[in-house]
Design a protein with these regions (language model features):
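A glycine-rich helix->loop->beta "capping" turn
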Residues: 5, 53-56, 76-89
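NAD(P)H-binding Rossmann-fold N-terminus in SDR/SDR-like oxidoreductases
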Residues: 17, 21
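Conserved glycine-rich cofactor-binding loop
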Residues: 8, 15-16
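Conserved glycine-rich Rossmann-like NAD(P)H-binding loop of the short-chain dehydrogenase/reductase
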Residues: 29-46
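Flexible cofactor-recognition loop at the NAD(P)H-binding site
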Residues: 16, 86-93
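Aromatic pocket-lining residues of Rossmann-like dinucleotide-binding sites
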Residues: 26
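The beta1-alpha1 cofactor-binding region of Rossmann-like NAD(H)/NADP(H)-dependent oxidoreductases
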Residues: 40-41, 60-73
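Flexible N-terminal pre-Rossmann segment of NAD(P)-dependent oxidoreductases
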Residues: 1-10
Length: 93
């Protein structure tokens, strides 16, 4: 089933744990994912792995405790995909 086909999904805390599992599931269902995480290294590694497998993903640094980071996440997502269809807040602050 491709419930997320051509949907742009922004996931915070996306590079490990539940966020990573959610990222993988949405990609497997055709979603385009912005991997937003405070660990740039893990986010980049996951994005590279998924892109190598053919997924349409991007990664960006994100910290829920920094207002500027929140603004930059939205700007980044809009610049890359021109829209956000789904936002999954998977991080605490």
């Amino acid at each position: 089933m491709n419930r997320f086909e051509n949907k742009v999904v922004v996931i915070t805390g996306a590079a490990s744990g539940i966020g990573e599992a959610t990222t993988r599931r949405i990609v497997s269902e055709g979603g385009k994912v912005v991997i937003a995480d405070h660990s740039e290294k893990r986010a980049e590694q996951l994005a590279n792995e998924l892109m190598h497998a053919g997924a349409d993903v991007r990664h960006v640094y994100f910290s829920a405790t920094e207002l500027q980071s929140c603004k930059e996440l939205i700007d980044f997502s809009m610049n890359e995909y021109q829209r956000i269809d789904v936002l999954i807040n998977n991080v605490g602050g």
